[in-house]
């Protein structure tokens, strides 16, 4: 019987890959303008070359405009918006006042003179009265009794206690006080220490919610009459940081979240005048980097709950003095020891003056992103008038000369119940950049985002087709090399099987 032959040869599988349409077909179906005239079915003509020039020129202009827009975006420009908003109620600002004389002469004791007499420029290094020929007789008598140190045993001296005890008392300075027509008291002023010593803040917000104004104009804010007590001023026989050539008070109007920085930001008010301060609240909003340079992170200070330039400066000055003098001044926060009078004179005052005037790099305080400040307009009238001086002298049991030299009135009020907003805004964002680029794409080459997707889709199909064809050819060649003789007869199979029986 003739055996049959079974052909067991394995043929490679032929995979059919979809070939992408020709470039001419894609060009005539694409939404990209102009390429249908470039990739045409006809031979290359002058018309085709012109379309190539037009298309490449448009593409060049498009790239130029896109680069310009991207560069403008990377400059992170901003615009400033100014607006005025009316409101029925406004929080009244904090008002800090400081007498320009920080130490009352009558409150100085023998122990004070022993420790701080040289700092106050009253005594020399030998504990003797300086410039005795300039001293008035009444002052000299007081100094003689207090500078007899022959049997004196000095006691402990603390600068904070000294400033607190000898500073002007608001109960003695405040002759009258009204807020929105209602009387206010010395207890409505909280004590705060500054470089001027013991100062006072009205409406600080520390003991309760801050007071508000419901109407603008004079008589709807704070009106105080003060006695600056010039007879308590330290006699000046030389220049020192603790003595003042001026008479009056320093005033700062600020928000409740901002500590007073009155030696740098305050304005002066002189005796013998009524000073009207018309305020308008300004709310400033700045942008952080890269559009601006404001500080948007929480404060790193251990002493202040909110970041402000005043808080940053105070914190920085404190660190500077602790590092250079190993102590702090009375108005500075923290737990470092207070400077002694010797350190005040030899280290603290010179170091702080140097920091304020020259070393601006050490205290680099960024602008906060949100600021509340108050613009001010000041006007003055003479007080007292000839008609009122006798009445005031009788009312307060003072001489007419004393009233003229010491009494002043400060009137702080809102101009109107509105506030001004000054806000920085991003001038060019991602949406604007995409809109400009999309508009230019439509103008120059008639393209959109979907057109770009069409191009990528066609390129993807072409790349996939070429890669798959290349892979299939390699696979076909490998199969031909390894399976060149895979054909067996049925007799060979039977012979192979019989060996196992």
From Swiss-Prot:
Gene that this sequence comes from: asic1a
InterPro entries: ENaC (IPR001873), ENaC_chordates (IPR004724), ENaC_CS (IPR020903)
Protein name from the UniProt record: Acid-sensing ion channel 1A
Protein topology in the membrane: Multi-pass membrane protein
Subunit structure: Homotrimer. Heterotrimer; with other ASIC proteins producing channel with different properties. Interacts with asic1c.
Predominant localisation class: membrane
Residue spans crossing the bilayer: 55-71, 430-460
Pfam families for the chain: ASC
Native organism: Danio rerio
Compartments in which it is found: Cell membrane; Postsynaptic cell membrane; Cell projection, Dendrite
One cellular component (GO) term of this entry: dendrite
Catalytic activity: Na(+)(in) = Na(+)(out); K(+)(in) = K(+)(out); Li(+)(in) = Li(+)(out); Ca(2+)(in) = Ca(2+)(out)
One BP annotation, GO: cellular response to pH
S-S bonds: 98-199, 177-184, 294-369, 312-365, 316-363, 325-347, 327-339
Glycosylation sites recorded in the entry for this protein: 164, 370
UniProt function note: Forms voltage-independent, pH-gated trimeric sodium channels that act as postsynaptic excitatory receptors in the nervous system, playing a crucial role in regulating synaptic plasticity, learning, and memory. Upon extracellular pH drop this channel elicits transient, fast activating, and completely desensitizing inward currents. Displays high selectivity for sodium ions but can also permit the permeation of other cations.
Record comment regarding domains: The second transmembrane domain (TM2) is a discontinuous alpha-helix disrupted by the GAS motif, which forms the selectivity filter by adopting an extended, belt-like conformation aligned approximately parallel to the membrane plane. This peptide belt encircles the waist of the channel and divides TM2 into two discontinuous helical segments. The distal helical segment of TM2 interacts with the cytoplasmic portion of the first transmembrane domain (TM1) from a neighboring subunit, contributing to the structural and functional integrity of the channel.
Extracellular side: 72-429
